[in-house]
Amino acid sequence: MNSIKLKFNCKDSLWQEHIGAGDFSFAAIFLTTWGIVLRAYLDTDDVFFEYGLSRCEPVSQRDGIDELVPDRPFNLKFDGSMTVKDTIRRADSVVYGTPLVQDGLEHETHRETDPKRETFYSTCMLFLDGPKSPIDADVVEGTILDDIEFEMKPVVNYDMVVYVLSGKVCYLSYNVTRVSDDQAAHVAATFETVAKCIADVPHRLVQEVESLSQLDVDRLKTWNAYQPIAVETCYQDLFRQRCDLHPNSPAVIAWDGSFTYDELDHFSSLLATRLQAAGIGPDVFVTICATRCRWIPVAMLGIIKARGAFCALDLSHPLDRLKDICDALKSTITITTPTDSNIARKLASTVIVIGGDAPVESDRITPMNDRPKPINGHPTNALYSVFTSGSSGKPKGVVVEHRSFVSSALASIQPLDIRPHDRVLHFSAYAFDISVFEVLTPLISGATIAIPSEKRRKESLTHAVQELGATWALLTPTVARLYDPDEFPSLRTLALGGELAQASDIALWQSKNVVVIYNPAECCPIGVSGPACPADGKFLGWSHTCQRAWIVDPRDHDKLPPIGAVGELLIEGPVVARCYAHDPNFSSPDSPFIQSTPSWMLRLRSNTPSGTRLYRTGDLARYGSDASLYYMGRKDSQIKIRGQRTEPGEIESNLHSILSKDKLGVAIVVLELRGSSKIIAFVSKDTGGLGGDSNTVGQLRIEAATEETDVCITKATSKLHSIMPAYMVPSAFLSVNYIPISRSGKIDRTRLKSFALSLPQETLLRVNNGLETGDLPESNEEHRLQRMYSLVLGISRDKVGMESDFFRLGGDSLQAMKLLALAPKEGLTDISYEDIFRYPRLKDLARKASQSVTIKKDGFGENSSVIHPFSLVIDGQSLIDMAAKQCDIERDSIEDIYPCTPMQASIISLAVKGKIMPFLTFGLALRDHVDTKRVKDTWHAAYRANSLLRTRIIVCAETGQLYQVVVGGDIFWDDDECGNFAQPKSGPSASIGGPLVRMKLVEGQLSIAIHRALYDNWSIRQLLNDISGAYNGLTLPSRPSFNCYVSYAARSLEAASSFCNAELGDSDLDAAKYPEPVSQNSHTNFRAWLGIRVFTCQKESIDVLASEFQLAWAMIAYARTNKKDVVFGVLSSGRSNASKDTKEIMGPIATVTPLRVTIDGTQDVGGALEELQYRQEEQAMYTHLGLRRIGQLGRNAAAACQIQTVLIVEPDLPDLRGVWFSNDATLPNHSDADASNYRLTIKCVVGPDCTDIFAIFDHQSLPIMEVKEILSQFEHILGQIHGKEASQLSVASIDTVNFKDWDTLHKLTEMPSVCRNGLLLSDPTILPQGQMKTFSAVEEAAAHCAFQDSLQEASIARDAKMQPKEPLSSADLISEINRYDLAIMRSRPSPESILLSELALTGDSHSSGTHTVFVTGANGFIGTQILRHCLEDPTIDRVIALVRGSSANEARSRTEESARRAQWWSDCHSQKLEVWPGDLAMPHLGLNETHWRRLADRTTINAIIHNGASVHWLKRYADLEATNVGATAQLLQLAVANPRLGFVYVSSGRYTDPNAESEEPAAANVAATAMPYSQTKFVAESLIRRTAARLPHGQTQVRIISLGLVIGDPLTGVVNADDYLWRLIATCVQAGEFNSSAGSEWMPISDVTSTALAIVQTALNPAGVPATIKPITGGLMWSEIWDLVTDMGYDMEPRPESEWMATVRRDLEREQERHPLWTLSHLVESRSQLNTDAGAGPAWADAWRGDEATTRNLKTAFRRSLRFLGEVGFLPGQKGQNTDGEVNGRAFTRAW
């Protein structure tokens, strides 16, 4: 046991007068003081402890220690209205009126089981002198202290013992296994505070005695020093930001479908528009009446966008309760789905139906990015309401504002470990406020809401989580303990809330990241959380930054108890709700919302603003020593049922109203039975007993049930079910002889609870229900159900028979879920949740289980449009024979035959002639831990469901007609496990008769070859989306077969021909001849790509933008040919205005059709655009006709089909996302393949705020300069059409540029370019209009060469005009970034290049799953550790290190030497290592041609770790540029061109949060440092930031690791002795002093091992790092650093900065080159650059901060590094010898 001396001077106080007068004893004063302390800590007026008195003899004469025992009980009942003096007198009477304790029995009897007493389980007070006259303190202090430890031994069974030695000397002794040192210190301080308070003013009331010590005050000031962080933003603004950032990320994945963020934004905006029209605005409530589905988030967001507030109704609640909620909110509008519309119409006068065929879902005409007209909203507007139980009998509606929820949600994301790619399970009932959190929080964190069906949620949660891929879930402990964590493989984080988690719950789920959460509904769903603590289930965690937690006196919230005391939890901050809906003005006298700021808060935090929101939770809690919170119970009778707050008063109030006519009294208690909470209702006919004394009315007993009572109870139960949720209806009714009351006149629930617990459970239930067991089970099903009933309900099997009713045995809905969870283990898979309620008797449920027949569904529905097999051909039988022969299959396997479409016929013709590759191949890399069998099974299911995948092509020899043949059988898998994926042959046999879909699955790579005749862009993406859904367990959607489209095309052939003839029959014969056609012989397939970017405001739909592009191109053709009749091709999706069935058909519907545009100069631009849009809509009906058939309509139509230019407009689609394949899948692009058939293709890829326009052309027949002019002209014209003043322009007034002077203009606007470090650099062109900026990039390469030749052909040149001046300004830095950035953008590969490269990748190292990592800077201090972790990582097969050296041997030797210096090299490391000699400052990194080709071939390297750099503080920017910037840009070219290539750049950090840093301000700061090295690193890092920002959504392979100072590892301590940190320490050690002014400043520091490991892990899994830049967190304050140095034995004195600087300058001047800081002296003079000047530089952002564990590990590594530096002679050794600055070969250094 440990002891603390208490400061208490009884002799100098007023007590001496009273003691001397005999008013009361010396002991009574101390006993009262300790009693008041316990009263404060335990929150009780009934205090019990024990005490002992010794004889009044000198210490030296005491016989032994037996006299020092607590042999007297002390029980004092405090009355707050009594004075302290009167209370001491009462204590004195207790001292002289109580007998001795015999054998400790009294001691055991008074030990409380109340959880509030757990800290003070037992305490006592021992007096070492008599109770009347204390002995002299001086004698005591001189004689007794040596004996204290010995004399404590007899009382070690107590948690705390107060030794009273005299009026001046007291000691608090405590059991260290039960009481911490910190806790004891606070108790001691409380004792001293109470003692002083009652001594100073003995006439004050007990309730006025101050128990808060100064120690408590200081600690509370530290914990709650800062006000909670409020986010003054509306929710919809945050959601809009997330939509703008990642529009195509999945927002919702549900059992009934899914939404991307863009789609969710679109549908909710449509709903918001309707709600606004209906009058919804700020603080107007709309209810949501719908079962769990994907439309719930749409409803919530629609209401929010309309600036209304929502309340989601729990449809499991009775209709009357739902009506009460609607009435309380004054809601007249409800949103529902078709399934629940009947209920909704009973609740509101206006019902809006969404989902299904409702207008909100089907209205696709509205642009996806349209949002409702803004209405003035404010963060203080109501966001939602949730209803909790109310003691008055009516539920209470909590009104939560935008600022409250937003502040709470944003502050919760990090503590709860919610990540951007998480799938958050939407499980909670809508009566629970957590349900709001589960929907709204993921949508502002970038996560996905995973919504199971109600059936899955109740019956098979494990399957629901697996199917949806949920990674984050929140469950109540009661629900969590129903399941096995192993059945949730996808789940990473489980939050437990709603009720206390037991230690067994936490132990059960320990394989997951388990967090506990807390907050009442009045303070937003979550505001306190922490990692689950198995040792203490009462642990709640810490408050989030959005709120502060205060523990107040439960009797008076204007008073604070001591830290560690049990008190009422009070929450402060913006998270506090506005009010209750029924009490907006806080008129209720017992309102828990505090309206005035308590005085203690103003005292502890003087800057607390007025209006601070405070809420009294009613929960009892206590502080831990680290500001954590522990739940200790309730101060009132409120209870939790299945996580729901329940007021017994509400249940009692309703029961009273029901039973009052029957003159029955009622009372409610809650018992923990069979692992769940049960509500027990006591009823009594003796209403007089309510007011009687239990001693007079007799023993509480069960009354025999009467028929009259049973009727009343049955009536009450039925009525309760109609007005209250099922969980609030009592599980049992007990008829008792009376209802006991307490002394205060209230129902004595404690006695009722004890009485109920004394009854056997079977008796409890039988009393109410008259249990019948019936016959014993016989069948297997009956025995299994008997066992299940017994296990779930916790009763013996012999009590369960055939007549046993699950619910009459005590079951409820929660235990029904448990029964279902157990059913599969018992072999009963056909029982549903509804079945248990429908057939609760065992015999009925067994009969249902035995009669059920499992119907295995493949998930394919009937097509809405059915075309009978062979109905589209005339001679079906002869075609079957022909197909069987050409396909080499049996006749019986042929399911259907129908004609090919014109588009398919054209593709087959080109493929047979060898003009195009018939098959396009792409690969999908499977994610880790994906079930490959499940992947195959899913593809098999899709193959069977989709007839197009089973389609082959045959040709009729007599007519040449092409037909499609649908065959049975299974998918064609390539069984070659070792070799490459065999490419289908070219030529006729590749397209005729054979399978058109082939697949191979080897080592985590799914390779797919699909014929062009089977798909278009929409089809292939939709196919993969469907398969992803099926893999998740969703039903494959039923889609019409492709024969429906063939039938539609045949039926509309005549109408299509008539339309096209009318459109093109009179067109100019030369209308389509731009560019001028070339002869067939001169046509080549060498395609070049040229691109520009224009910034477009996509307020219009993509169709509107398409019309602008079409008009711009028509004006170009007109300007260059002087012909007003213009014809060019457009690629149509074929789905724009087709029927619903046609839109859903998979197949090659997209096709190129001629578009005719007649230039009318008198027409205004707006009119011309409207006409083009109308033509698009009309023409979309007939795109299936095809160019060949159109050309047969006549001479003019045939001429129009000789189109030379095709315009393609398509959205910038993101990479597909799936739970089974990685996000970097590059899909074949049908439009790019078609581009090779035309002389010029203009492809416009429309993004959110810009459009990339590519020209794809044959550069041998169409000069590059001409195409550059065309694109510049296109941009110029488009800028006028798209501009704000376009509506005022006529077509004739559009400036098309005078091309006679084009060459002159081009020379004037062209900026100088240079080729630097192997990169083509040029400045962007800025046009006079100022509306658009472009980048220009030229790539000339044959398709089979991809892009690599352009890299190899780049030459080195430096134009003197482009040489940056020294020193560089911020503008110079931005200019440098721009020039390099243009060259990097040039490396963006064409989709065709990606496609062709994908073909080359099949079967290579990527397919086989091998990993090769390329590392630069591998022989430096950090680089060698990176190399080590790469070589030791089992997932990496080969490591290639680029190292400077004249030969491979020299480079390898340098690499191994560095590894040995770092003390990790062994011969086994050489097996995977390959060293390439090179030089980062050279073109192609100084690699030879072979090595460079391997680096750039997109197959050899999987990841690049770029750590190499020239680190020198004295060189100019120009000297460092090639190595630090040029090399980075060259490597970035490779990363941009290869979506599979991971790229990690190792950089150095700056003060700010690296992911929140803006380029221009950062450039200004870096330029101000005038440090060329830092400037080169900044330029390189900015290039990577820009590159990452441009990457397609989902392509996340480019990352930056940002470092602070790096020290040695904890094992060896090897460091780079040239680092500034060590040179500074050596300087201070040498001077014997350090700068004390900077002691409180913090520096980011990491050890080299953890740093290198983080770099390698990021390279292998860049998608695992959510942001572009990952700072390596952790660090130390300078004071901690100096403590570590001095702890190593170095004597140094703290000095103010001015004195310290003077010493350093003096030493520098004296020693010069020999001084450790000589080469870095400029850093000493400009310390603000490294934040070492107190107050001179900004503090490091919180993003750099680490946790306590990181700090501990850092200190260990720091000590080892210091020891290493002493060992190598850099620092003085243990004997204190001076260092001359020389370091032996064991440390790393730099060549200055």
From Swiss-Prot:
Residues 239-642 are annotated as: Adenylation (A) domain. Keywords: Ligase, Phosphopantetheine, Phosphoprotein, Transferase. GO terms for biological process: amino acid activation for nonribosomal peptide biosynthetic process; indole alkaloid biosynthetic process. Residues 779-853 form the Carrier domain. The modification O-(pantetheine 4'-phosphoryl)serine is found at residue 813. GO terms for molecular function: ligase activity; phosphopantetheine binding; transferase activity. Residues 895-1285 are annotated as: Condensation (C) domain. GO terms for cellular component: cytoplasm. It is an enzyme of class 2 (transferase). Pfam families: AMP-binding, Condensation, NAD_binding_4, PP-binding. Residues 1415-1640 are annotated as: Reductase (R) domain. NRP synthetases are composed of discrete domains (adenylation (A), thiolation (T) or peptidyl carrier protein (PCP) and condensation (C) domains) which when grouped together are referred to as a single module. Each module is responsible for the recognition (via the A domain) and incorporation of a single amino acid into the growing peptide product. Thus, an NRP synthetase is generally composed of one or more modules and can terminate in a thioesterase domain (TE) or reductase domain (R) that releases the newly synthesized peptide from the enzyme. Belongs to the NRP synthetase family. This is D-lysergyl-peptide-synthetase subunit 3. It comes from Claviceps purpurea (strain 20.1) (Ergot fungus). The lineage of its organism: Eukaryota, Fungi, Dikarya, Ascomycota, Pezizomycotina.
